[in-house]
């Protein structure tokens, strides 16, 4: 039986297990046979047949919640993904391999957590409690890093051969604990809430705002603490205390700010089966566009993760830019403003028209950063790279949300994290560490050595960006075929 609309005034019928009824605006319901899911392409066709416009009115509270929770969540992720790298590099002289291991362990923790909590939030039909409760615990876990200091470690582990090695291990372990709470709140619940609260008419614009937050968070964190001496343990105590406290307070604010969406939980009762729902061959076969887009997104993020864990160290140590924030900050602001408007290109022109220029900017930025070291040219290269990075995040993010099956947003956040975090978080930093294996080293004051990141990380990232096209070309053909069938 083919999908059809049940019009207002008709009694909502009951169908055999596996078949679905999905609510549409103006009291309409969409019936789908067993095994089919209401992806964006199906919904768009059905809406056009009855003259409906897919338009979600997002109020001021929605956008306020979007900006606050997205920004503060990304501030916390910046502390983990970039500041922890600087933290263990400065305090414990961690190697590139240790940094790579930390990023990989965090990626695994994020993926497992998102699969578990995403499916759980779908089962009980609640997002708000996971967002707010998660942010509260997230803040406490960040605060705990204020106590990971050499003097504390030496007092607690007097028999340890190397307090620095213990410090690196503790940071990696606590990073995974922090990731559990952060992924529960942000990756699983908050991102599912965004999918529930938007549709294909405004996802590009919303993703434009959401995608610019990671770099705005970098600006907030590194700009806010620019005057601090990162070689002093007291500095990190202050940083972790402030960030942890802010995240905790936002968790409290969320109880008053976030509107709980009404979710359909019928069909989501089998929790443990739903954890792996998105990995079933039948589900993959029913949503091919979603999974091909996710694969392209994974390769895109591998390219980013090759250089991103070492980017600040490259500016600071390799290029000798002590005030790198003064160069990095304007590039972030301009790239964020660019992305806020660029997301609308996806809404009005579609995926193909939006993703190709974004990738072109990203690759051009890599080329400039690889060949040049002067401050002015590095700024231009950084701006191009950041514009391409943020625009790409917005476009891929909107595309994946559009093709997420309705009523399964929580379950499918795990798949999104596989493409955005797990695969890139393991492969990307490992490639970066391999590229930097024979990098120059410097001798620290205590006799230990530290590596110096070099421009080869951008060359490796460029190669990965070229590889995106191997997936992107088939994806664009699939979209063109869908469009011709819908016409």
Locate the predicted segments by residue.
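Juxtamembrane intracellular "pre-TM" segments in multi-pass secondary transporters
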Residues: 54-60, 262-294, 487
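Helix-loop boundary and gating motifs at the non-cytosolic
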Residues: 55-107, 289-319, 325
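Glycine-rich segments within core transmembrane alpha-helices of 12-TM secondary carriers
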Residues: 111, 204-226, 417-429
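Helix-to-loop junctions at the C-terminal end of transmembrane segments
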Residues: 113-126, 338-350, 436
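A membrane-interface helix-boundary motif in multi-pass transporters
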Residues: 127, 229-245, 436-466
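Structural signature of the two symmetry-related core transmembrane helices
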Residues: 129-144, 353-368
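Multi-pass alpha-helical transporter architecture, strongest
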Residues: 146-150, 248-258, 456-487
């Amino acid at each position: 039986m083919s999908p059809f609309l049940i019009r207002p005034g008709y009694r909502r019928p009951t169908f055999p297990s596996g078949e679905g009824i999905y609510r549409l605006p103006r009291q309409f319901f969409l019936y789908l046979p067993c095994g089919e899911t209401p992806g964006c392409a199906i919904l768009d066709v059905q809406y056009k047949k009855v003259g409906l416009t897919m338009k979600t009115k997002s109020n001021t509270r929605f956008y306020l919640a979007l900006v606050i929770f997205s920004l503060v969540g990304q501030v916390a992720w910046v502390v983990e993904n970039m500041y922890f790298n600087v933290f263990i590099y400065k305090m414990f002289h961690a190697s590139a391999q240790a940094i790579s291991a930390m990023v990989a362990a965090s990626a695994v923790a994020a993926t497992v957590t998102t699969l578990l909590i995403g499916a759980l939030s779908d089962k009980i039909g609640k997002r708000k409690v996971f967002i707010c409760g998660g942010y509260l615990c997230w803040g406490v876990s960040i605060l705990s890093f204020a106590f990971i200091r050499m003097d504390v470690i030496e007092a607690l582990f007097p028999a340890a051969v190397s307090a620095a090695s213990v410090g690196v291990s503790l940071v990696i372990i606590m990073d995974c604990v922090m990731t559990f709470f952060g992924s529960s709140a942000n990756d699983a619940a908050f991102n599912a809430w965004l999918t529930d609260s938007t549709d294909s008419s405004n996802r590009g614009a919303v993703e434009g705002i959401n995608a610019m937050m990671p770099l705005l968070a970098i600006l907030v964190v590194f700009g806010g603490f620019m005057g601090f001496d990162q070689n002093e343990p007291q500095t990190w105590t202050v940083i972790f205390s402030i960030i942890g406290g802010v995240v905790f307070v936002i968790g409290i604010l969320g109880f008053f700010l976030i509107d709980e969406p009404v979710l359909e939980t019928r069909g989501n009762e089998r929790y443990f089966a739903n954890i792996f729902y998105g990995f079933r061959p039948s589900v993959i076969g029913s949503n091919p566009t979603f999974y091909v887009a996710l694969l392209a997104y994974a390769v895109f993020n591998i390219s980013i993760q090759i250089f991103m864990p070492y980017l600040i160290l490259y500016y600071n140590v390799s290029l000798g830019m002590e005030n790198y924030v003064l160069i990095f900050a304007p590039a972030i602001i301009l790239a964020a403003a660019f992305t806020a408007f660029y997301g609308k290109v996806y809404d009005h022109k579609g995926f193909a028209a939006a993703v190709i220029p974004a990738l072109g900017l990203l690759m051009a930025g890599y080329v400039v950063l690889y060949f040049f070291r002067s401050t002015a040219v590095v700024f231009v290269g950084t701006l191009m790279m950041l514009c391409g990075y943020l625009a790409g995040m917005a476009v891929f993010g909107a595309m994946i949300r559009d093709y997420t099956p309705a009523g399964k947003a929580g379950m499918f956040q795990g798949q999104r994290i596989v493409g955005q975090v797990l695969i890139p978080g393991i492969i990307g930093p490992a490639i970066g560490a391999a590229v930097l294996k024979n990098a120059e080293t410097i001798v620290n004051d205590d006799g230990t050595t530290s590596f110096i990141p070099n421009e080869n990380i951008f060359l490796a990232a460029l190669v990965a960006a070229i590889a995106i096209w191997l997936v992107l070309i088939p994806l664009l053909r699939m979209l063109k075929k869908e469009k011709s069938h819908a016409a």
